Amino acid sequence: MTAEKITQGTEGLNVPNEPIIPFIIGDGIGPDIWKAASRVIDAAVEKAYNGEKRIEWKEVLAGQKAFDTTGEWLPQETLDTIKEYLIAVKGPLTTPIGGGIRSLNVALRQELDLFTCLRPVRWFKGVPSPVKRPQDVDMVIFRENTEDIYAGIEFKEGTTEVKKVIDFLQNEMGATNIRFPETSGIGIKPVSKEGTERLVRAAIQYAIDNNRKSVTLVHKGNIMKFTEGSFKQWGYDLALTEFGDQVFTWQQYDEIVEKEGRDAANVAQEKAEKEGKIIIKDSIADIFLQQILTRPAEHDVVATMNLNGDYISDALAAQVGGIGIAPGANINYETGHAIFEATHGTAPKYAGLNKVNPSSVILSSVLMLEHLGWQEAADKITDSIEDTIASKVVTYDFARLMDGAEEVSTSAFADELIKNLK
């Protein structure tokens, strides 16, 4: 068997039996969790395919290790390698302290145009949770990754640049509601039709491919009408234009209410649901954040902008056990580029202690296996995590909250997962 690159074809990824996949080990606890995760992934692939498939791991540098080795936090060679090999896995990265150096995670997303942050959130039986019914949470978040106020277009208070921006806004654009112009910093919030459409397209296609029931467009369009409000409208428009016979939208529902009454609209939606159509709906962000606590079962796939998605993803993760067990991926569904990553930080005080929970990067690797079409290996890991947590053999973060738990190290937890692969 010869290791080969994954390539992008007209119908999606072309995945060889021995793909070369770059990995970034990560800072802080990165080496601990990656060592555990890679053993679990390799064991699951071996068990699923009896040696007919395997992954050839290729280390690339980013973060502290890259800086110590090359003097750069994110070497161009790393970006070029990921561009060439399409798929990568990464541990948590330190954001360098100091002005002018952006988050390495954000830099990777922007340089590779990874426009979707994919965050599936579900509960594993036995995981400690602060809510009464964590089992009702089963959502997949599609967070737009390249626009919104996270685009990094900011001007610091007191600088020549911000004075120019404020002067332009006040004198050229007639903006009279900058309350304290002399002491304000300014941030720009770009939201485009193209950026919205490619995100919503990916979310709806995911819902169709995975037999989900609905896609909720989450926004603050009631306040920010030409950015978040446009996101909502562009999302609805795309749903009907590109997926017309496969979806039923709340805007269609409202039109039926206006013409034929609410009873007729309810009948139309029930008919669409029975036919397996995806219901496209929307929710204002603050109401949505209430509903994920009070009635989470009403939401399935979620498409939202960058800032909303950041809040929502971590708020949902807290309901099912925290970011230690939350997977994440950053994907460009058009070019095939994707990075699968731990969603938590570097936790430097635990570095090298062989103590922390490796589940986030393991479950992110499950997403990677699913993305590659290696569902059998992915399912084996998911089932093993379920069985292992149910048996109460867990790392310290869960053990301290579970009665009768056996606390084990990072490496011992990986051993248990490998033992429970079926």
UniProtKB/Swiss-Prot annotation:
For the ligand (Mg(2+)), the binding residues are D310
Which catalysed reactions does the entry list for this protein?
Answer: D-threo-isocitrate + NADP(+) = 2-oxoglutarate + CO2 + NADPH
Q: Which residues bind D-threo-isocitrate?
A: S103, N105, R109, R119, R143
Cofactor note text: Binds 1 Mg(2+) or Mn(2+) ion per subunit.
What family, per the record?
Answer: Belongs to the isocitrate and isopropylmalate dehydrogenases family.
**Lineage start:** Bacteria, Bacillati, Bacillota, Bacilli, Bacillales
**Function recorded in the entry:** Catalyzes the oxidative decarboxylation of isocitrate to 2-oxoglutarate and carbon dioxide with the concomitant reduction of NADP(+).
Keyword Membrane on entry? no
The species is: Staphylococcus aureus (strain MRSA252)
Q: Tell me what this protein is called.
A: Isocitrate dehydrogenase [NADP]
Q: Which UniProt keywords apply?
A: Glyoxylate bypass, Magnesium, Manganese, Metal-binding, NADP, Oxidoreductase, Tricarboxylic acid cycle
